[in-house]
């Protein structure tokens, strides 16, 4: 983290930090990054997302687990930006999800605001814990706590290290 640490991440920077790609890249922008502390992700929900074909035909509802994954991706971007991990083959693994509650349906046309706050973890730590909440137009859609392991491989994925 330096004085030049960005407070926002556009899709280009997000893709330089996260290994996720379509159809599993679930955050479009991250703003209000407070290094190693918190951030707000944005996810524009569109009818073109593949899960809407079967969840549910005629009544498209974003699966709750994808909302939680979007919060986790937001948290990973916050840590990745804070630690200057763009282009460094940064990986994050879910370790646990606690106290998850879904409060409203999310569907095409909604913009998810993904608020994440680190409750455990510090620069260089492998295990982090976060509180997250997802909102649509200021209305709570989901809230949970989750734990993740941050991993910085010594070689690109798929290559021997």
Swiss-Prot record:
GO cellular component: cytoplasm; membrane
Record-level GO BP terms: fatty acid biosynthetic process; lipid A biosynthetic process
Intracellular or extracellular location(s): Cytoplasm
Record keywords: Cytoplasm, Lipid A biosynthesis, Lipid biosynthesis, Lipid metabolism, Lyase
InterPro entries found in the cross-reference section: FabA_FabZ, FabZ, HotDog_dom_sf
UniProt-listed Enzyme Commission number(s): 4.2.1.59
Reaction(s) the record says it catalyses: a (3R)-hydroxyacyl-[ACP] = a (2E)-enoyl-[ACP] + H2O
Function according to Swiss-Prot or TrEMBL: Involved in unsaturated fatty acids biosynthesis. Catalyzes the dehydration of short chain beta-hydroxyacyl-ACPs and long chain saturated and unsaturated beta-hydroxyacyl-ACPs.
Name used for this protein in its record: 3-hydroxyacyl-[acyl-carrier-protein] dehydratase FabZ
Organism: Jannaschia sp. (strain CCS1)
């Amino acid at each position: 983290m330096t004085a030049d640490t960005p407070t926002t991440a556009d899709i280009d920077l997000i893709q330089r930090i996260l290994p996720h790609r379509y159809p599993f890249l679930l955050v479009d922008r991250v703003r209000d990054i407070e290094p190693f502390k918190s951030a707000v992700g944005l996810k524009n929900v569109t009818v073109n997302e593949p899960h809407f074909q079967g969840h549910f035909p005629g009544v498209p509802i974003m699966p709750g687990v994808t909302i939680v994954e979007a919060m986790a991706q937001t948290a990973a971007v916050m840590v990745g930006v804070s630690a200057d991990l763009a282009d460094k083959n940064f990986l994050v693994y879910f370790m646990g999800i606690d106290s998850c509650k879904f409060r409203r349906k999310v569907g095409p046309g909604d913009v998810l605001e993904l608020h994440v706050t680190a409750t455990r973890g510090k620069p260089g730590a492998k295990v982090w814990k976060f509180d997250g909440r997802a909102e649509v137009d200021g209305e709570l859609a989901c809230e949970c706590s989750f734990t993740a392991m941050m991993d910085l491989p010594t070689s690109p994925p798929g290559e021997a290290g």
